[in-house]
């Protein structure tokens, strides 16, 4: 966009974000989303056409790549149909867990009838999209990632890492781009893929569009101002079981958070507490998910819990994870120990009905995502339970109070065990 120095300065201020640091003494992180091409010529993100001054001529060079879409084989629920009808341009769909974002996203792709790229950031998420494409269209999707480069067909599902390395090859190939778990778009890897794409339609999907680090302020830059938030539905209401443990979580601002978590997860009493809880809820008929961000802790707890368990961490190859989780979904295993990074987003094991928080959490979006793993509807599934272990110490009490406040805000019943 051609502009005067005054206009450039105004837009630069509008598109520069100061993100507070975790430490009050550290300077804020600066995110600048205006690019200077040369003197008097700038580039702004596609979602911020509102910053273009009046009187400017806008030449739309976005790509329309029309393709023949197969018929969508299913009916949408009324709330999904409403979102489907509303989508005419770029948008964010901020839908509660289990609402059906993947399902509705594919219906929208069929409505727009453009060659479509689905962007995912993990192999399991990519595989879920591939399966959903087969289910709703009865076709195979193209795949980009894990050594594959197949752009044939109306829908292609790709991994961010491979797409990022090949931006020049894909930026003019698609007419619609859908970013799953779009709250990651503040990361340069994701934002470059979205911002570089010439696709006419850009749709972001997420269950949580607030980030604890405050970077959600940039979301509209890439998807515009239209945020569609359908009602919460199609989920089971969980009950919160609060377990006072008597185990202390270290206090002290001079002790790094990571060191405090490590000390907790190396505490033998804590390991036995988590393991016994997992075994107890499995004995009641639940399929149990225990999450933590400490791999050795998960391994130790799985060993203590017994043969009824599987453990899925980053050390497990992608091709083995599905066969392991199938032992929970279809087999005889009842307890799944897994890392937060893997199981916080999008992984659908619908018969999971009990979540045990193995690591202290003070992040509301993360808590929402994790609880989402156990509240999906399934026939004959036990009423879901979230097990919240309360620890001693000022930090632990403050964080537990925040979680209790979140549960109360949702209107969920709490029981102290």
Feature roles, as predicted:
Residues 127, 131, 139-152, 165, ...:
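Conserved helicase ATPase core of P-loop NTP-dependent helicases/translocases
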Residues 89-112, 117:
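Walker A/P-loop
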Residues 12-63:
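Interdomain "pre-motor" coupling segment immediately N-terminal to P-loop NTPase/helicase cores
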Residues 175-176, 181-241, 407:
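Post-DEXD/H (motif II) to motif III coupling segment of the RecA-like Helicase ATP-binding lobe
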Residues 146-176, 187-192, 342:
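Conserved helix/coil segment N-terminal to the catalytic DExD/H
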Residues 109, 252-293, 299-303:
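Conserved interdomain hinge at the start of the Helicase C-terminal
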Residues 34, 58-94:
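Conserved pre-motif I regulatory segment
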Residues 164, 314-410:
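Conserved RecA-like P-loop NTPase helicase motor core
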């Amino acid at each position: 966009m051609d502009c005067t120095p005054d206009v450039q300065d105004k837009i630069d201020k509008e598109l520069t974000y100061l993100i507070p640091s975790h430490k009050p003494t550290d300077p804020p992180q600066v995110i600048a989303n205006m690019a200077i091409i040369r003197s008097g010529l700038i580039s702004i993100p596609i979602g911020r056409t509102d910053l273009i001054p009046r009187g400017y001529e806008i030449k739309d060079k976005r790509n329309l790549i029309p393709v023949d879409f197969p018929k969508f084989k299913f009916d949408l629920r009324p709330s999904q149909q409403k979102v489907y009808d509303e989508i005419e341009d770029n948008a964010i769909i901020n839908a509660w867990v289990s609402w059906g974002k993947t399902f509705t996203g594919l219906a929208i792709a069929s409505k727009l009838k453009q060659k479509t790229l689905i962007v995912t950031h993990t192999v399991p998420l990519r595989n879920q999209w591939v399966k959903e494409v087969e289910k709703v269209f009865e076709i195979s999707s193209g795949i980009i990632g894990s050594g594959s480069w197949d752009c044939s067909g109306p829908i292609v599902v790709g991994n961010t890492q491979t797409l990022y390395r090949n931006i020049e090859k894909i930026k003019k190939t698609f007419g619609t781009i859908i970013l799953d778990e779009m709250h990651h778009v503040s990361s340069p890897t994701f934002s470059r893929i979205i911002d570089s794409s010439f696709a006419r339609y850009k749709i972001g999907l997420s269950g949580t569009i607030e980030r604890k680090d405050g970077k959600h302020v940039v979301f509209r830059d890439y998807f515009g101002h239209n945020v569609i938030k359908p009602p919460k539905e199609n989920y089971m209401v969980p009950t919160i079981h609060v377990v006072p443990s008597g185990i202390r979580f270290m206090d002290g601002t001079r002790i790094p958070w990571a060191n405090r978590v490590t000390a907790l997860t190396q505490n033998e009493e804590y390991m036995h507490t988590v393991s016994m809880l997992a075994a107890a809820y499995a004995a009641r008929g639940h399929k149990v998910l225990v999450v933590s961000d400490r791999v050795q802790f998960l391994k130790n707890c799985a060993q203590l819990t017994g043969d009824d368990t599987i453990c899925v961490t980053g050390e497990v190859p992608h091709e083995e994870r599905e066969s392991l989780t199938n032992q929970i979904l279809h087999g005889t295993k009842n307890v799944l120990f897994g890392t937060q990074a893997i199981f916080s987003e999008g992984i659908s094991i619908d018969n999971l009905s009990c979540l045990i928080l193995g690591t202290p959490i003070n992040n509301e979006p993360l808590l929402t995502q994790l609880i989402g793993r156990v509240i999906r509807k399934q026939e004959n599934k036990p009423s879901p339970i979230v097990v919240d272990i309360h620890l001693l110490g000022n930090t632990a009490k403050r964080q537990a109070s925040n979680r209790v406040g979140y549960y109360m805000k949702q209107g969920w019943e709490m029981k102290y065990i």
